[in-house]
Amino acid sequence: MKNTVTRLVCLVAVALATVGVRAEKFSAGGISFEEPKSWQTQKPSSSMRKAQFAIKGKDGKSAEVVFFHFGPGEAGGVAANVKRWLGQFKEPADQLNAKTVIETINGTKVTYVTAVGTFMKGPPFGGNKIPVPNSGLIGAIIEGKQGAVFIKATGPKTIVKNAEKDMKTMVAKALKK
């Protein structure tokens, strides 16, 4: 009995030790991604979401990262989505210190968007929205062969800013395969 308990404890210890080092892989729009180690997988809260993650801050707060893919020609294009994302803030777009940067990675166009302000958290179409001051947004729109993949992180501006490098590295790795 003692040997069985010892083996079980060792097995659990090894399993717990490896949880933090394994990277989860997932795909959206025919593009395979590897989850950054600082992100925690969550069950998507909507059938529209292809993947969903949390990024925990040291203060217990967290940011949310979501992936969407609707198929070729769907979801209104890059400019419409950038406008929609910036419109999710209380302030007008010209007061968000918003930046849009376009890159081409291995022949695929990627539009990155950043903004800081009061994010209006809530359902995308209607419903009650809750103002969340000092929020940040980092988004990536990948114009893939099977249609655009939309990645959006929102939450406390410090957490979102710190996640920018991980998001860009994840996108670059996915497109260089």
Question: What are the language-model segments listed below?
Answer:
Residues 9-17:
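Bacterial N-terminal signal peptides
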Residues 37, 41, 45-50, 82-142:
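Signature of long, low-cysteine stretches enriched in small and polar/charged residues
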Residues 39, 145-177:
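Surface-exposed amphipathic alpha-helical segments
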Residues 1-10:
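Bacterial N-terminal signal peptides that target proteins for export
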Residues 52-84:
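A short acidic-to-branched-hydrophobic micro-motif
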Residues 24-42:
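Short N-terminal segments immediately surrounding and downstream of signal-peptide cleavage
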Residues 58, 70-72, 116-120, 146, ...:
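Solvent-exposed coil/turn segments that connect beta secondary-structure elements
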Residues 19-23:
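Sec/Tat signal peptide C-region and signal peptidase I cleavage site
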